[in-house]
């Protein structure tokens, strides 16, 4: 059985990232003992520790993303689904079932699926995927922050904090900002 989740859907900057984890049924209790839960409920340090430990507890995992041009072309919802599909396709063994965080199943994946609203809080498989995706994306954004100073990306990870919004108003958008998300901030400073 596999779980898949995405992160970065509401960000102003950078890709949407997804991870899929394939976990043998008998190993699910080990995830709970390890302390796996929704990545948003964990400190950055704890998330990082779990992301390092998870490969020892899961059969396999896949991580993928949809970049800003893709988000602009197809919209954030479709880009999120695409990133999750790609993450599942990176698994070396196709699972019998996929639990998908959110209200949508993956339209181009021909296997049994269940959409789980709030799945990152309800399913250890989806929680494990959310941790891997979050750590991967946060690491990427932290590296990109060096190329794009002035937006406080190392702290906000691309989300719309006050400092990030101020940077957009002062410097404009970079090529890795999502234009549709940023336009209103830049045009309407209030």
UniProtKB/Swiss-Prot annotation:
Which compartments is it annotated to reside in? Answer: Cytoplasm
Annotated catalysed reactions: Endonucleolytic cleavage to 5'-phosphomonoester
Any one GO molecular function term: RNA-DNA hybrid ribonuclease activity
Cofactor-binding details, from the entry: Manganese or magnesium. Binds 1 divalent metal ion per monomer in the absence of substrate. May bind a second metal ion after substrate binding.
Give the main localization category.
Answer: cytoplasm
Q: Residue ranges of the RNase H type-2 domain?
A: 1-190
Q: Does this entry carry the keyword NAD?
A: no
Gene Ontology cellular component terms for the protein in this record? cytoplasm; ribonuclease H2 complex
Q: What is its EC number?
A: 3.1.26.4
User: Per the similarity annotation, which family is this?
Assistant: Belongs to the RNase HII family.
Q: What is the role of this chain?
A: Endonuclease that specifically degrades the RNA of RNA-DNA hybrids.
NCBIfam families associated with the record = PRK00015.1-3 (NF000595)
What is the protein's name according to its record? Ribonuclease HII
């Amino acid at each position: 059985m596999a779980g898949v989740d995405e992160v970065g859907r509401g960000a102003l900057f950078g890709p949407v990232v997804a991870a899929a984890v394939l976990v043998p049924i008998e190993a699910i209790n080990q995830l709970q003992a390890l302390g796996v839960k929704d990545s948003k409920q964990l400190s950055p340090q704890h998330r990082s520790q779990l992301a390092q430990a998870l490969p020892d507890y899961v059969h396999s995992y896949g991580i993928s993303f949809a970049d800003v041009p893709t988000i602009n072309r197809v919209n954030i919802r479709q880009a999120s689904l695409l990133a999750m599909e790609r993450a599942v396709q990176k698994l070396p063994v196709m699972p019998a079932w996929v639990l998908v965080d959110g209200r949508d199943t993956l339209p181009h994946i021909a296997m049994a699926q269940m959409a789980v609203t709030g799945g990152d809080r309800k399913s250890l498989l989806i929680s494990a995927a959310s941790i891997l995706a979050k750590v991967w994306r946060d690491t990427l954004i932290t590296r990109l922050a060096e190329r794009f100073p002035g937006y406080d990306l190392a702290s906000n990870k691309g989300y719309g904090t006050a400092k990030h919004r101020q940077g957009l108003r002062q410097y404009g958008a970079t090529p890795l900002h999502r234009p549709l998300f940023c336009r209103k901030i830049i045009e309407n400073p209030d």
